[in-house]
Amino acid sequence: MKSIYNYDLKNLEIKLTKLGEKPFRAKQVFSWLYEKRVDSFDEMTNLSFDLREKLKENFVLNTLKLVKQQTAADETSKYLLECEDGALIETVLMKHDYGYSVCVTSQVGCAMGCKFCASGLLKAKRNLSAGELVNQIMFVQKDLDKREKRVSHIVVMGIGEPFMNYPNVMEFIACVNNDKGLNIGARHITISTCGIAPVIKRFADEMSQVNLAISLHAPNDALRSQIMPVNDMFNLEELFEALHYYQKKSNRRLTFEYILIDGVNDTLQQAKELVELVKSMNAYVNLIPYNEVEENPFRPTQPKNAAAFYDYLKRHNVQCVIRREKGSEIDAACGQLRANVEKQRSARR
Ligand code: SAH
């Protein structure tokens, strides 16, 4: 049965009307789901018994089960969740000085095959539904409710390529963004993509207030193609053409993510190429210390190289930060917890 978290307010109105209900009921149900955050239809006490029964016959609520939770000293918390079909996904909560953000998974596994990433080791299995995306936020929000805190920001930066699951990700955003629901502002939501150029343009047309982050990781086509096969589909020229289009439409500052990998993309020559590539954009560069993945040969850059790379960008007027690592002691990086649990499971089989 379909989870009711799959419906944004508009679609819930349509669905309830089809079930013979007045459209305003959808607002009441929405409020129970997202403001009062109940766990069952029986708790929706201002609805008639008949309507509650009808809801129970047609929908389920929570479809995710907690398999494992790990919390680090800095309050980063990682939830390993199991979907109804047994698929495992990871959701991460992070505390910042500006609030709490949740990093959601958009696909079970990933087909993009970036060489440095742990998610690719698991291959792509399927897209998550909009309801499974919303459910991840609700799972974490209900946990935060115990501390009377609220999810203020969302990053679609977990396992998967969100722009290969575009319609579901957009429905998810419409749902959490709704002011009758969680009311998380578009400007507090960031989608990260490895660079699916045509979808970036579509996104610019439809969701121009949502932030966009691009996983760049290399300053030229030769290197980028080596470590990110997506570059053979959409090279840097096509990617940047789409990004200029996005900036024209949205006027928003872009984020470039650049993982620093020892001896691969962390030289001063590469910093120079990176400056050339991004200097004409309204953007900042997030330099991210690479998180080691046991199964592949890449290692994090040396701190002195990271510092030199950062200084070079700064001196050439590229806005950038070296992002602090959060929760590395809990396998918080990119598919690592899930990969580790799957390894244990298959060892047991
Ligand atoms: N598919 C999307 C979102 C998921 S990956 C994208 O590519 O943007 C989220 C970010 O983590 C990406 O920038 C990705 O390149 C990066 N990443 C993957 N593996 C990593 C690792 N081992 N250490 C640090 N960052 C990693």
Predicted regions and their residues:
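Generic beta-strand structural signal
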Residues: 77, 89, 100-104, 112, ...
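Auxiliary Fe-S-binding modules of radical SAM enzymes
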Residues: 1-89, 244-253, 260-349
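Conserved AdoMet/S-adenosylmethionine-binding subsite of the radical SAM
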Residues: 141-320
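Residue-level structural signal for beta-strand termini and adjacent loop
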Residues: 93-94, 168
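Canonical Radical SAM [4Fe-4S] cluster-binding loop centered on the CxxxCxxC motif
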Residues: 95-138
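Short polar/acidic secondary-structure junctions
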Residues: 71, 84, 94-96, 145, ...
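Alpha-helix N-cap/helix-start and coil->helix boundary motif
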Residues: 9, 111, 196-198, 220-221, ...
